[in-house]
Amino acid sequence: MARLTKRRQADTKAIQHLWAAIEIIRNQKQIANIDRITKYMSRVHGMHPKETTRQLSLAVKDGLIVETLTVGCKGSKAGIEQEGYWLPGDEIDWETENHDWYCFECHLPGEVLICDLCFRVYHSKCLSDEFRLRDSSSPWQCPVCRSIKKKNTNKQEMGTYLRFIVSRMKERAIDLNKKGKDNKHPMYRRLVHSAVDVPTIQEKVNEGKYRSYEEFKADAQLLLHNTVIFYGADSEQADIARMLYKDTCHELDELQLCKNCFYLSNARPDNWFCYPCIPNHELVWAKMKGFGFWPAKVMQKEDNQVDVRFFGHHHQRAWIPSENIQDITVNIHRLHVKRSMGWKKACDELELHQRFLREGRFWKSKNEDRGEEEAESSISSTSNEQLKVTQEPRAKKGRRNQSVEPKKEEPEPETEAVSSSQEIPTMPQPIEKVSVSTQTKKLSASSPRMLHRSTQTTNDGVCQSMCHDKYTKIFNDFKDRMKSDHKRETERVVREALEKLRSEMEEEKRQAVNKAVANMQGEMDRKCKQVKEKCKEEFVEEIKKLATQHKQLISQTKKKQWCYNCEEEAMYHCCWNTSYCSIKCQQEHWHAEHKRTCRRKR
């Protein structure tokens, strides 16, 4: 049955200050009475004696401080009974407490509502309308228990995702471990009901003890709860714990948004941003203020804003107004973009992503990849062996054919070096006719044979000279064309290299400027903080100095005598409480009233 009860009332930070005061006083072999405790709290922590007394009485009611009657054994109070205060010892069984003492939401004491399933307690005002108590006769479950009860998730899959989150929690919890290592403090368990830290959370993740993401989130919130209770809401440790919890909630939100993106962004395989998700993200052209349109994936939409993640090197996230979003099918020439090297790389990544979409290529787990690789390797090895077997006989047969007919093929002419666009000149037809006619007359007589040989030699020389001139001209033209093409290619390469260098220099310049601005801002903040602290110290010193001067003036004023008639500094004494600054004032006061009340002996 649900019920409201006051578990504790004292402030946790005040309790720790009181513990320190009692411990210091006891170490000095003195009784920790109310006077010594109030003096210590006023001197060290600036707490008013009335507030100290109130917090001390509440701590006694909460059982966090033990009150006894002690008899003094030395000094002015020897033999006199006086109230003394002690730290609680091990006689109290703290392990039997089933519920926390402080609200899980605001971390403060007071009247709380107790959960029937777990150790958590809440103030009624800290609960939303959905979780507030409706009927006191029925059992009540806290928001954490209700959220854990709703979810059912694959443990193996959840463990993979939670390991990424825990690894980031460990990185961010380094400062928390440096700043706060008091969980071994003897009084730690008097304030913290259920202790937890990042190594404990990691161990539970590795052992698969979490049943849902909400249960993991509850442990992260418990870490924040314990830190605020033990170190205080305004402590540096509490700020680190808040940041750790906020980052953990952000990681869980990203996981719920898209599990594929969350896994790939943490595992970071090659081309991880190009793999399609299930379901696929909408592809758009997004335009940030001060930049042109850039290819991006839509992560979520909220009101008139669109959360996108850009293609490119850094894969940055941004909220873009919906009017600055264009569909990916829009013609790129209508967008008027500046085609820098970074933009081209982003478009290349977009094309690869679209190709993966067309091919239905999704990211697979390591076990599936190993199976496919083994199958492919076995198939490739078998095909390579078959290829070797089929190729070896062909090579031997070719060698036998070459040994039988070594000179069957004629050498190719030099015209093979000319490109296919050139026209190769042919031999003149009349020369071929002369050579044929002379060859047919060889059988008739020897004198015509000699004439034919001389004619053929002359014609062959003329043909060779004509071919040489034409081929020389063709090769010269081809050489000039190659030079011009080479020049144009060189200019293009140089131009692209200059553009790349310019874009890289602009990027480095922008990063340097941003870094310098951030450093200057940090330095300015540090200087402002120093100036504020210095002004505050000077102000306090000035107040102390003025108070001292005022006290001295009051003391000097009290030591003087003053005229009863005009209140100026007196010079003439009349009687026990009457003095005057001049004879005139004495006479005026004497005739007015003093002659009837003067006690001076005459």
Swiss-Prot record:
CDD domains cross-referenced by the UniProt entry: Bromo_ZMYND11, PHD_BS69, PWWP_BS69
Induction: Down-regulated in breast cancer patients with poor prognosis.
Start and end residues of each Bromo domain: 149-255
Feature: compositional bias, Polar residues: 435-459
GO molecular function terms attached to this record: double-stranded DNA binding; histone H3K36me3 reader activity; methylated histone binding; transcription corepressor activity; zinc ion binding
Tissues expressed in: Ubiquitous.
Effect seen on changing residue 287 to A: Abolishes binding to DNA. No effect on nuclear location
PTM comment: Sumoylated following its interaction with PIAS1 and UBE2I.
Biological process per Gene Ontology, one example term: negative regulation of canonical NF-kappaB signal transduction
Motif residue range(s): Nuclear localization signal: 394-400
MYND-type zinc finger locations on the chain: 563-598
One of the record's GO cellular component terms: chromosome
Modified-residue entries (Phosphoserine), positions: 421
Disulfide links within the chain: none
Phosphoprotein recorded as keyword: yes
Binding site for Zn(2+) 2: 574-575, 594, 598
Zinc finger (PHD-type): 100-148
SAMD1-like winged helix (WH) domain ranges (all copies): 6-82
InterPro entries given in the database record: Bromodomain, Bromodomain-like_sf, MYND_ZMYND11_ZMYD8, PWWP_BS69, PWWP_dom, SAMD1-like_WH, Zinc_finger_PHD-type_CS, ZMY11
Domain of life: Eukaryota
Region (Disordered): 366-459
Residues annotated as binding Zn(2+) 1: 563, 566, 581, 585
The protein's role, per its UniProt record: Chromatin reader that specifically recognizes and binds histone H3.3 trimethylated at 'Lys-36' (H3.3K36me3) and regulates RNA polymerase II elongation. Does not bind other histone H3 subtypes (H3.1 or H3.2). Colocalizes with highly expressed genes and functions as a transcription corepressor by modulating RNA polymerase II at the elongation stage. Binds non-specifically to dsDNA. Acts as a tumor-suppressor by repressing a transcriptional program essential for tumor cell growth. (Microbial infection) Inhibits Epstein-Barr virus EBNA2-mediated transcriptional activation and host cell proliferation, through direct interaction.
Protein name: Zinc finger MYND domain-containing protein 11
Lineage, opening ranks: Eukaryota, Metazoa, Chordata, Craniata, Vertebrata
